[in-house]
C-alpha cells in the first residue's frame, strides 16, 4: 500500500452582495466570498490537497479562473472532477482534516451538512471528514472580516 499526504490552502476576500458558500452549504451572511466560481474556500482547499497528494498540480491548473466554463460553478462539481482525477490514478481518500479561519459567520452549526456533502462527493464515510473553525482574535484580514482562509490536509491510499 502506498500512502500520500496532501496539503491545501485557499483564501478569498469577503464582499457584500455575494452568497456565502462553505463546504457546499449556502450560509446566511451579509457577505460572501469573491471569486470566479462560487468561491467555496473549503472545497477549494480540499481540491488542492487532493491534487497535491496525487502529484497532479493545483486547482488553478485544472480549473483556471480565466475559463468561462467555471464562472460561478458549484465547487462541489470541482471536487467531483478532482475526485475523478485522483481515482484515475488509483487513489482513494483515507481521511480529510480541515480548518476554516474567519470571524463571522459562525460555521460549526453547518459542519455536519458540510461533512456530508464532502463525504458524498468523495465516496467516503462522514467520519473520515473533519471540519474545524477558528478565528484570528481580530488580527489581520480575517480578523477585520475582509476575507477568510481554509486549510486542508488529506491522506490518500493507492488501491
Which positions does each model-derived feature cover?
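RNase III-family endoribonuclease catalytic core
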Residues: 2-114, 122
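Glycine-rich, mobile lid/loop segments that gate access to catalytic sites or pores
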Residues: 118
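Short active-site-adjacent structural elements
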Residues: 108-109, 138-141
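SAM-dependent methyltransferases
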Residues: 1-2, 159
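Short acidic capping loops at alpha-helix termini that bridge into adjacent secondary structure
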Residues: 125-128
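Pyridoxal 5′-phosphate
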Residues: 131-135
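C-terminal edge-of-domain segments
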Residues: 142-159
